[in-house]
Amino acid sequence: MDSYFTLQSNIEASGEFLDRKSRFIAQLVHIESEDEANAFIEMVRKRHYDARHNVPAWILADGRERQSDDGEPSRTSGMPTLEVLRGAELKNVCCVVTRYFGGTLLGPGGLVRAYTAATQAAVAAAQEAGQIVEMTSVVPVDVHVAYPQYEQVLRLAQDSGAKVADTDYADTVTIHLVFKAGEQEPFCAKMRELMAGREEIEVGAPEFAEF
């Protein structure tokens, strides 16, 4: 997987759906782990302690995912919520749909439609607010060069598709670069050729970040 979409950190998107006086409130956040998902689920349960159901679903970038019907009939709530997240190609997100019962049974089909609609509303709200971001597999590369070579190396890096994250000026110049995974290799080869073996390059481990 080279990239995926997720919700911005420290954001909670929400959406609502009403059907025959039952109120469905979808709450969507970014997570990095199962523990973070569980913590958010527990927080929502405390927030809506008086609700009939708090239905959770979450997906991690490593492929793990989980959902629960939280007392609703089997596969009428948690799975529809999860399917919306899958359909939006979201990873590292957790959605909890709270239901306040309105006194009328909606039936399996009605429940599927309601939980789907509430989750879709939360995803749409995040999209409209520009809160959905693409996370790309990137590789950090630190280059240490003498001052006379700085401009030349900077141009080479930018021509090679790098983004400059930061620059440190000391006895030498350290340029902190970020490449899409795989694009750092041609740059490193050109650096070895350009500097005739005198280059100092530190290549970090791949990670996911906005690029």
Model-derived segments and spans:
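C-terminal regulatory domains involved in ligand/effector binding and gene-expression control
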Residues: 1-76, 189, 202-211
